[in-house]
Every structure is written in C-alpha cells, then in structure tokens.
C-alpha cells in the first residue's frame, strides 16, 4: 500500500520500527500509525503480564506532504488497554515528557530525511507537552 505521501506503508513500518520499541503494528490501519511507550511501572510486585504502566500513546496520520500527530498520557492496564487519566506524580510526569520528547525528535528527524514534516493534528488542541520547535 502506498500512502498519500507516495511512500510505501511497509517501508515506513520498517523505518518506524527502527526508532525503538514504540510502534504497534497491529493497531496501524490505512494511513494511520499507532505508537506507545510503557515508561513507568505502577507496581513491580505483580507478575510481569499483570503489571500496569504509566505511559503515552501517539496516533500518527500520513497526509500528502506531512504527518500529523495527537498523543495522550495515561495508564496501560493489565488487560492491555490505554486509559487517559491524570497523573499526579511529578517524577512520573517528567519521565513521560522526557520519553515523548525523545521519540518525537527521532520521528521528526526521520520524516525530515524523507522530505516530510511532522505537525500536531489540526484538531489537537490539548497538547500538554510542546513538541515542535
């Protein structure tokens, strides 16, 4: 499948995978890509498959000459679902912001190398962390 930008989707998936453990291929559809990061374990006592994590997820949409994004901070529960919830621990928020900025920078640089831009979605008004320079 070729995206509106003219790039084959399979090649983009390969490049996105090389950015790190972020892309969830099974949740990517058509010209939309899904990334997430399980940044901070809520409690290490449960068995690994039953742990919950604080983290973020990002939806990326391919358009003609750009990719647009929207993201959320929240909880990845033991069933494997994301829920947007307020996070009150300063250290956790700082870690989420750091990992999101790091990923955003790598993603932006990759897209620039392909002569594409990365911008917030037109309807993404609630950007808790400013990412674009």
Swiss-Prot record:
The keyword Coiled coil is annotated on this UniProt entry? yes
Concerning InterPro entries, the annotation shows: Tscrpt_reg_Crl, Tscrpt_reg_Crl_sf
Similarity comment text for this entry: Belongs to the Crl family.
This molecule's function is given as: Binds to the sigma-S subunit of RNA polymerase, activating expression of sigma-S-regulated genes. Stimulates RNA polymerase holoenzyme formation and may bind to several other sigma factors, such as sigma-70 and sigma-32.
Origin species, per record, is Salmonella choleraesuis (strain SC-B67)
Source taxon at top rank = Bacteria
Biological process (GO) annotations held by this record are: positive regulation of DNA-templated transcription
Q: Which residues form a coiled coil?
A: 90-111
| Annotated region described as Essential for activity, given as residue ranges | 99-122
Q: Which HAMAP family match?
A: Crl
Q: Where in the cell is it found?
A: Cytoplasm
Q: Specify the protein name.
A: Sigma factor-binding protein Crl
Keyword Nucleotide-binding listed? The answer is no
Q: Which GO terms describe its cellular component?
A: cytoplasm
State a single Pfam family of this protein. Answer: Crl
Entry keywords, A to Z:
Activator, Coiled coil, Cytoplasm, Transcription, Transcription regulation
